[in-house]
Swiss-Prot record:
The keyword Electron transport does not apply. Keywords: Activator, Differentiation, Metal-binding, Nucleus, Transcription, Transcription regulation, Zinc, Zinc-finger. The keyword Transcription regulation applies. One of its GO terms (biological process) is epidermis development. One of its GO terms (molecular function) is promoter-specific chromatin binding. This is Zinc finger protein 750. Zn(2+) binds at C27, C30, H43, C49. It is found in: Nucleus. A zinc finger (CCHC-type) spans 25-51. One of its GO terms (cellular component) is nucleus. Residues 67-78, 418-428 have a biased composition (Polar residues). It comes from the Eukaryota.
C-alpha cells in the first residue's frame, strides 16, 4: 500500500489535496497555500519559490508525509508520536517506525523525497529530529526555530517546503520525517537517497556539501539519533576515503587537471574514481596514499588501463616517479608550455627563419646582384643588423604578439617564410624594423604610404618640370637616400617617402612650381625629409602598403621618383599617364616604377628590377641598389621620367592619391592591374608588382 501510494506521488510528483482540509499545505518561504502539495512543490521546484530544489526535496518529504497524512493523517500522526521517541531514542525504533511509515505511506512520500534530500536531508533530518520533538507542537514556530536551530536545515527546518497547516501534521510529518531520515541516513538508506537524489536533483554535490555538515552534525545529532551515530562513521569513512582517492586522483588531476581538480574531486571522486577504477585504486591508494601525487598518477594512469593496479604497491614507486615525471613533464608541463612555446618558438623560429631568409635573401640577392651587393649590403646589411636587433626585440614582441596572430590569417605569414618569403623577408626586416621603429605611427604610416607613393610620383612631378636639374638632386638624394638607407634603412624608407610626401604636398599645392629651385627644394626636401621625417613617417611608410623594401624602393623612387615616372614618362606622356596611373595605382610600387622605364636607364632598372623580381627581392631593394649602385642610371631615368611625368603629374597625383589611399584598402590588386596597363612597356614589372602587391598585402596584414 505504501509502495503503491509512494509510487503514485512519485509519478505525478504531487499529492492529492487532503480531503476536507482547505489549503492544507503552505509553501515554506512563500505565503502560497494549497491543498495540493504538487502546486507548491512545483512552485518551489521551478524556483518560483526562493527555496532551492534541494530544500524542496528535503521539505517535500514532509509534504509527502502530509500526503500520507492527508490519506491517513491520523495514522501518520500515530507513528509520529512513536517516531518522536524513536527518533530521539533508538535508530532501530526509527527503522521500525520507518517501516510503519512506509506502510503508512509517509515512508513512500518521505522516502521518495528523503532519497532526494538525504544529501542534506540526513543531517537535516537529524537536526529536525530534536527540532520536531521540540517544535512539533508549534507548526509555524517549528520551521523558524528549526531554521534557527540548524543553519544546515535551510530547507530542513521545515521538513517540507510546504508546511502542513495542522500542527499535528507538522509534528507527525516532521517526526515521521526524522525516522525516515534516520533510516535513510543509514548507509543503505543513504545510498538509495543518493541515487534517488541524484536522479531527482544533483544530490551528489549537495550530499558532499552535506557530508561535511553531516560530519559535524552527527556528533550533535548522534545522541538524538543513534542511527546517525552509525551513519556518521559511514559518512566519515566515505569522506575520508574520498580525500585519499581525491588526493591520489589529484595526482592524476595534475595530468588530467580538467577532469580531476580539487574543486571537482569531491563530486568526481565516486564517479570518476569508479571510472578510473578508483575502487581498486582505493585499496592500493591507501598504500601509496602518502605518495599519491607521485605514485598515484602512475597508478592512476595505469588504473585507467587497469594494468598496474595489481602492481600499484610495488611498481608504482619506480614507475610512479618515472611515469609521473614523464607524464607531468611531457603532458602536464611540456604540452601546455610546448604548445605555447611551440607557438612562440615556432613563430620565433619561423621569424628567425624568415630573418635567416631575410638576411640570406638580401645576401643571396646581394650575391646575385654583385654590383648591387655592396649597395644592398650597405642598405640591407645594416638594416638586418639594425633591424634584426629591433626585430629580435620585435620578434619577441611580435613572437609574443605574432604567436597568437600567427594562427590568424591577418598576421599569418609576417614572420614566417612564404613563397614570397623574400619579399616578406624584406618586409620583416625593414617592415618589422620600421614597425618597431614607429609602431605607434603605424596607423598614420598606412596613410602616409599612399602619400609616399604620391610623394614619389609628385617629386616626380617636381622632377617633371626640371628633370635634369632635379636629376642631380635625385642623384644626390638617391645616394643620400642610399646612404641614409644603409644608415637608417627603415627610417630612411619612411623619411624618403615621407619627404616626398611633404614635397608631394608642395608639388600638389604648386605642381607648376616645379621650377628647378622648387624642384631642388623637393629633392632637397626629399633628402632632408629623410633626415627630418625619417622616424615619424618611417614607421608609417614601413607600415604603408609597401614593404620596407618597397619603402626602400620608394626611397630610390623618391630619390629617383622618375622610376615611377620613368616607366610612365619614358614611353610617352600618354603611356606615362597610363603607366603613371598604373604606377600611381601601384603608388610607390617600385616594380612598376622599375620595369616600366623604357629609357635605357629605365631598361637597366627594369632589368635590375627583373633581377630583383626574379629573386623575389623587393623591387625596393633592387631600386635602392640601382640608385646607390648606379645613381647615374637612376638620374637619367629619373630625368626622363621626370620630364614626362609632367603631363601625367596632374593625373598621377590624383590617381596616386586615390589609388594610394585605396591601395591600403584594396587597390593593391588594382595596382598590379593598372601597373600592368602602365607596364605594357615592361611586363616584368608586373611580376614584381604582383609580388609587391602580395608583399604589400602581407605587410598590410602585418601592420
Amino acid at each position: 500500500m505504501s509502495l503503491l501510494k509512494e509510487r503514485k506521488p512519485k509519478k505525478p510528483h504531487y499529492i492529492p489535496r487532503p480531503p476536507g482540509k482547505p489549503f492544507k499545505y503552505k509553501c515554506f518561504q512563500c505565503p502560497f497555500t494549497c491543498n495540493e502539495k504538487s502546486h507548491l512543490f512545483n512552485h518551489m521546484k521551478y524556483g518560483l519559490c526562493k527555496n532551492s530544489i534541494t530544500l524542496v526535496s528535503e521539505q517535500d518529504r514532509v509534504p509527502k508525509c502530509s500526503k500520507p497524512n492527508s490519506s491517513d493523517p491520523k495514522q501518520t500522526n500515530q507513528p509520529d508520536p512513536v517516531v518522536k521517541p524513536t527518533s530521539s531514542k533508538p535508530v532501530p525504533s526509527g527503522l521500525s517506525h520507518l517501516d510503519a511509515k512506509l506502510q503508512h505511506s509517509l515512508a513512500k512520500d518521505d522516502i521518495k523525497e528523503n532519497l532526494d534530500l538525504h544529501a542534506r536531508g540526513p543531517h537535516r533530518c537529524l537536526g529536525q529530529k530534536p527540532t520536531p520533538h521540540k517544535e512539533a507542537a508549534p507548526p509555524s514556530p517549528a520551521p523558524e526555530a528549526a531554521v534557527g536551530t540548524q543553519p544546515v536545515l535551510e530547507g530542513a527546518v521545515r521538513p517540507s517546503a510546504f508546511v502542513p497547516v495542522g500542527e499535528h501534521r507538522l509534528k507527525g510529518q516532521e517526526l515521521t520525517e526524522t525516522p525516515e531520515a534516520l533510516a535513510l541516513t543509514h548507509a543503505p538508506a543513504k545510498a538509495s537517497s543518493f541515487h534517488t537524489k541524484s536522479a531527482f536533483h544533483a544530490p551528489g554535490y549537495p550530499w558532499r556539501a552535506g557530508s561535511p555538515f553531516l560530519t559535524p552534525e552527527f556528533p550533535h545529532k548522534i545522541p538524538s539519533t543513534k542511527g546517525f551515530g552509525a551513519t556518521s562513521p559511514y559518512v566519515h569513512p566515505s569522506i575520508t576515503e574520498y580525500p585519499p582517492h581525491f588526493y591520489t586522483e589529484h595526482g592524476l588531476a595534475t595530468i588530467y587537471s580538467p577532469y580531476l581538480l580539487a574543486g571537482n574531486s569531491p563530486e568526481c571522486d565516486s564517479p570518476l574514481l569508479s571510472v578510473y577504477g578508483a575502487q581498486d585504486q582505493r585499496h592500493f591508494l591507501p598504500h601509496p596514499g602518502p605518495i599519491p601525487k607521485h605514485l598515484n598518477p602512475a597508478p592512476s594512469t595505469y588504473d585507467h588501463y587497469r594494468f598496474f593496479q595489481q602492481y600499484h604497491s610495488s611498481l608504482p614507486i619506480p614507475y610512479g616517479f618515472y611515469r609521473p615525471e614523464s607524464a607531468f613533464s611531457s603532458y602536464g608541463l611540456r604540452l601546455p608550455p610546448v604548445a605555447g612555446i611551440s607557438r612562440d618558438q615556432s613563430s620565433h623560429l619561423l621569424e628567425e627563419a624568415a630573418l635567416g631568409y631575410q638576411a640570406l635573401s638580401p645576401s643571396k640577392l646581394n650575391s646575385s646582384n654583385s654590383h648591387k651587393k655592396h649597395t644592398e649590403l650597405e642598405k640591407q646589411s645594416p638594416t638586418p643588423e639594425a633591424k634584426e636587433p629591433s626585430k629580435d626585440g620585435q620578434r619577441d614582441t611580435e613572437g609574443t604578439k605574432m604567436s597568437p596572430r600567427a594562427g590568424s590569417a591577418a598576421t599569418g605569414s609576417p614572420g614566417r617564410p612564404s613563397p614570397t618569403n623574400f619579399t616578406q623577408t624584406s618586409q620583416p626586416c625593414a617592415g618589422l624594423c620600421g614597425l618597431s621603429d614607429a609602431p605607434a605611427s603605424s596607423a598614420p604610416g598606412r596613410i602616409p604610404p599612399p602619400e609616399q607613393g604620391l610623394a614619389a610620383f609628385k617629386p616626380i612631378k617636381k622632377n617633371t618640370e626640371h628633370p635634369h636639374s632635379q636629376a642631380p638632386e635625385n642623384r644626390a638624394v638617391s645616394p643620400k637616400s642610399l646612404e641614409a638607407l644603409s644608415t637608417d634603412a627603415p627610417t630612411q624608407l619612411g623619411s624618403l617617402e615621407a619627404a616626398p610626401s611633404s614635397p608631394e604636398d608642395g608639388s600638389r599645392a604648386a605642381p607648376l612650381n616645379l621650377s628647378t629651385k622648387p624642384e631642388a627644394e623637393p629633392a632637397a626636401t626629399c633628402s632632408p625629409a629623410h633626415g627630418g621625417f625619417v622616424e615619424p613617417q618611417d614607421a608609417p611608410l614601413n607600415l604603408s602598403v609597401k614593404d620596407p623594401c618597397n619603402a626602400l624602393t620608394s626611397r630610390p623612387s623618391v630619390c629617383s621618383p622618375p622610376r615611377g615616372a620613368e616607366p610612365a614618362a619614358a614611353p610617352t606622356p600618354s603611356p606615362t599617364q597610363q603607366r603613371e596611373p598604373a604606377s600611381s595605382g601601384d603608388g610607390p610600387d617600385p616594380s612598376s616604377v622599375e620595369a616600366p622605364v623604357p629609357s635605357p636607364t629605365g631598361k637597366a632598372q627594369d632589368i635590375r628590377a627583373a633581377d630583383s623580381d626574379e629573386q623575389k627581392q623587393t623591387a625596393a631593394v633592387a631600386l635602392c641598389q640601382l640608385a646607390a649602385y648606379s645613381p647615374g642610371n637612376v638620374e637619367p631615368a629619373a630625368q626622363e621620367p621626370t620630364c614626362r611625368p609632367d603631363a601625367p603629374t596632374p593625373r598621377a597625383p590624383e590617381s596616386q592619391e586615390a589609388q594610394c589611399d585605396l591601395r591600403p584598402k584594396g587597390q593593391k590588386r588594382t595596382s598590379p592591374r593598372e601597373v600592368g596597363k602602365g607596364q605594357q612597356g615592361s611586363k616584368k614589372a608586373k611580376p614584381s608588382d604582383t609580388a609587391r602587391v602580395f608583399t604589400l598585402r602581407k605587410r598590410t596584414r602585418v601592420s
